[in-house]
Amino acid sequence: MDLDLVLITGMSGSGKSVALHALEDAGYYCVDNLPPELLTAFIALQHEQQATRVAIAMDVRSGVSLPIVPQQLEALRQDGVSLRSLFLDATTDALLRRYSETRRRHPLSRQEGRNDVPEQERVLVQAIELERELLADLRDGADVIDTSLIRPAQLQSYIKALISAPQSSALTLVFESFAFKRGVPLDADYVFDVRMLPNPHYVPALRPLTGRDAPVVEWLREHDDVARMYDDIEQFLSRWLDALARDHRSYVTVAIGCTGGQHRSVFLVEQLARAFGTRWVALKRHRELDAG
């Protein structure tokens, strides 16, 4: 079955509609909130119509039908469907902020006309926690994208970059820099802490620059600890990536964090993406730089 299928799931308020619009712009036929009971028949219909690119969004509104989805996805893979499952996630604080800004109601929220703000937030937190429990199995079987700190336009660009990765590649690597002070990315498969490395922040001439700028690159390359850290990460990934590919992983996110997400982590992400890009599809994300 020559069909490229992308399944979008995730937390309410995490950006699923934005992701679906990005896929639509990329030429996918998109369906939002398809009931799981109709998935197999829908895919069979797309095959009859010789569709080649289809994207489906599912979420917690599917309710009691959600547990059947993982088995359905495995059956589709066995039938030869090229399937990529993406789960959009965000921190509870980020979701609370978005609901506060949009004043939309969470699909699992039972608040009816409550005017007490603390009580509204308490009920919303309960709804978010329940949703996490209901979607746990779907999250475990998907490639997770943390949208907590990225804008809609950035999410659209990132989704398009992911789906444009060659299908012939066994694995797509995503190298992501971040600042520990703003939290560890939820989508990280591996996290490396490089805060112990020499910090260009304390060099006045380098402070306003980033790990992509030549003066910072040259300064970091002069320090042996930086080279040793790079070698250790490179050797670890080289040892295990083939095993991850054999385990049918589509994406692996390697997050590298420093204090501000501006110099050391950015430098290492750039270097590692360049090195691994010779064999694998390697994408880069600089969370703090991209956030402006």
From Swiss-Prot:
Concerning SUPFAM superfamilies, the annotation shows: P-loop containing nucleoside triphosphate hydrolases
The membrane-spanning stretches of this chain are none
Q: Which InterPro entries does this chain map to?
A: P-loop_NTPase (IPR027417), RapZ-like (IPR005337), RapZ-like_N (IPR053930), RapZ_C (IPR053931)
> Which keywords describe this protein according to UniProt?
ATP-binding, GTP-binding, Nucleotide-binding
- Pfam families with a match to the protein in the record: PapZ_C, RapZ-like_N
**Job description of the protein:** Displays ATPase and GTPase activities.
What is the similarity comment for this entry? Belongs to the RapZ-like family.
Spell out the NCBIfam families in the cross-references. PRK05416.1
Protein name as annotated: Nucleotide-binding protein Vapar_4338
Its Gene Ontology molecular function terms? ATP binding; GTP binding
Identify the residues that bind ATP: 10-17
Chain residues that bind GTP: 59-62
Family annotation (HAMAP family): RapZ_like (MF_00636)
Top-level lineage group: Bacteria
